């Protein structure tokens, strides 16, 4: 059965307004009150009783709940998504860069190779909320592929899914390697049917922060269901040494109404509120940031208590601005560089209240 046609699965549904029951993150409460005055955020961190006292809930008829869904994630008592059940852990994913396998060609150039497999896989995006995803290599987002400018890249794609798929890389490459339906059929490229395979091969250019995704229609469905990943091309001379992080801003339409009910960085709502990202005071931190959010026109990243240098698309070694908030439309990406001069816990989140309420919120734990 095509999971897209299953419009009303009780275990998948979630409304945007009926949010979270309590995150058990008491240390976050003082910062939280400065974020947004909305009751759902206080529910997520402080529990229903305290939230009701501070922000009484307005009367809302059940029929007005978006999507009409009854099931929703429950964070009460510190409930969390089990990374082992999903087969991937956002705490590990944030520093996981896949360099593939390399060998020298006769010309002396480095050949870097990967294998990506598309599959159908149910994942949990919030406690009790299962989602019928399409994945590359068993995870959402797919592996963060990393290489160096000028290398020869070879990506073997195997479609193990029940649907036709491709891989479209952002970068400079021949038309046959574009992963675009209608370009390459008859030569093994274009749309790759279930059970089929194709090898994409091209030069790593230009350097910067890029990404890849399926390009089969309906495009919104293939992206929203999880077929995407980050693709980093390092400059030939590299970048200054840093603690490097990958953050993919995404979301999930859990009741299939073309509107997201869960927002996140690296797939699991509120994961980095439960498990803050640990960094060292005064150490250079580099964040590779990608917005692949479907159904919403824009996303944003804001950090508390600090500013960062921003390099749009990462194709220049000089930052474009020094700020604490940036916006990205779908497919936009960039590199953020910063140092934390103070120890302690600092929040980062989407500077759109609804996204933060529904999972796109976390913390840095600065040590030293």
Predicted regions and their residues:
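N-terminal secretory signal peptides
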Residues: 1-18, 22-29, 33, 41-43
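C-terminal segment of N-terminal export signals and the immediately downstream linker at the start
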Residues: 12-13, 33-106
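Short, glycine/small-residue-enriched coil/turn segments at secondary-structure junctions
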Residues: 105-106, 140-153, 272-284
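Short amphipathic
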Residues: 112-119, 243-249
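Histidine- and aromatic-enriched segments that form or immediately flank copper-ligand environments
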Residues: 113-231, 295-329, 349-365
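Exposed beta-strand face motif in extracellular beta-rich ectodomains
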Residues: 208-210, 285, 344-346
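Low-complexity, Pro/Ser/Thr- and charge-rich linker/hinge segments at domain boundaries
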Residues: 232-248
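Acidic-aromatic/histidine active-site loop/patch
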Residues: 244-281
């Amino acid at each position: 059965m095509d999971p897209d046609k299953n419009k009303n699965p009780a275990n998948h549904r979630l409304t945007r307004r009926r949010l979270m029951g309590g995150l058990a993150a008491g240390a976050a409460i003082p910062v939280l009150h400065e974020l947004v005055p909305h009751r759902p955020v206080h529910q997520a961190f402080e529990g229903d009783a305290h939230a009701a006292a501070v922000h009484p809930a307005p009367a809302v008829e059940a029929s007005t709940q978006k999507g009409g869904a009854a099931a929703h994630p429950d964070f009460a008592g510190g409930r969390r998504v089990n990374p082992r059940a999903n087969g991937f852990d956002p705490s590990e994913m944030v520093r996981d860069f896949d360099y593939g396998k390399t060998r020298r060609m006769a010309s002396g150039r480095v050949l870097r190779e990967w294998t990506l497999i598309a599959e159908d896989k149910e994942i949990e995006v919030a406690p009790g909320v299962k989602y019928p995803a399409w994945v590359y290599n068993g995870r959402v987002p797919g592996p963060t592929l990393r290489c160096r400018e000028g290398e020869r890249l070879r990506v073997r794609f195997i479609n193990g899914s029940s649907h036709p798929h491709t891989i479209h890389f952002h970068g400079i490459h021949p038309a046959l390697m574009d992963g675009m339906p209608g370009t390459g059929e008859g030569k093994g490229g274009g749309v790759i049917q279930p059970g089929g395979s194709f090898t994409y091969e091209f030069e790593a250019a230009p350097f910067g922060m890029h990404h890849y995704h399926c390009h089969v229609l309906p495009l919104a469905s293939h992206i929203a269901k999880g077929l995407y990943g980050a693709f980093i091309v390092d400059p030939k001379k590299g970048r200054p040494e840093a603690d490097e992080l990958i953050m993919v801003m995404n979301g999930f339409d859990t009741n299939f109404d073309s509107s997201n009910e869960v927002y996140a960085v690296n797939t699991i709502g509120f994961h980095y509120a439960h498990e803050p990202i640990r960094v060292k005071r005064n150490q250079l931190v580099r964040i590779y940031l990608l917005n692949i959010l479907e159904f919403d026109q824009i996303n944003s990243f804001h950090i508390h208590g600090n500013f960062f240098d921003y390099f749009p698309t990462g194709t220049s070694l000089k930052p474009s601005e020094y700020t604490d908030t940036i916006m990205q439309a779908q497919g936009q990406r960039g590199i953020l560089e910063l140092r934390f001069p103070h120890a302690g816990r600092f929040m980062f989140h989407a500077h759109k209240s609804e996204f933060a309420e529904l999972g796109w919120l976390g913390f840095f734990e600065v040590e030293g």
